[in-house]
Amino acid sequence: DIINDSSDSRLVNRATQGKYIPGSIFKIITTLDYMRENKNYNKFNYYCDGKARFKGFSIKCFDGTAHGSEDLTDAFAHSCNSAFSTIGDKLNVTKYRKTAEDLLFNKDLPLDIDYNQSVFALDSTSTQFDITQTSIGQGKTTVSPAHMAMIASAIANDGVLMKPYIIDRVENSSSNIVKQTKEQKYKTLMTSDEAKQLRKYMSAVCTYGTGKIMANANYKAYGKT
């Protein structure tokens, strides 16, 4: 496996073949499933003292930061590990897995070049530790950068994923176009309302959250760090 062969790893296209623990960007998937399982998600409230406590272990926020009282927008913007591990602990793992697979985890990706499938590792046998770790982007779940870019693009496109392509057009020596790639809809990953709500959360990240360095940009920024 070239992915695990350090001597040849320079040959790997890390954008599509890299298998990485996602980190806090996975909170997008956790948030989407929480929204689907809890129609009153806008009433979410959590008090963060810097640590969430579970039986036999605890999960801390970055640098032990205590975020105080948070709604779901605040928890997402602050990337609050305490809030999201608590959210994850309350999710139905079967539904959580389905949401991840709706977003093409454990599925083929619409790519015409070599890639590695992203893996959502939770199932009915998973422990509380595994579930809470996964909900904050740690644990055994892995994803490629290209796959997360597809999810972000679908959120921007009202839930619809377009088929990625590399070559836009082919021109001859006279600069005449001899072949033009046509845009193709691949799949609807989420509803337009879900995408709209996730954009609101991602806007908060770049307005006052962990990505607030973008707050004064001369364009509207959405993100998750």
Identify the residue ranges that each predicted region occupies.
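Beta-lactam-recognizing serine transpeptidase/beta-lactamase-like catalytic domain environment
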Residues: 1-24, 29-225
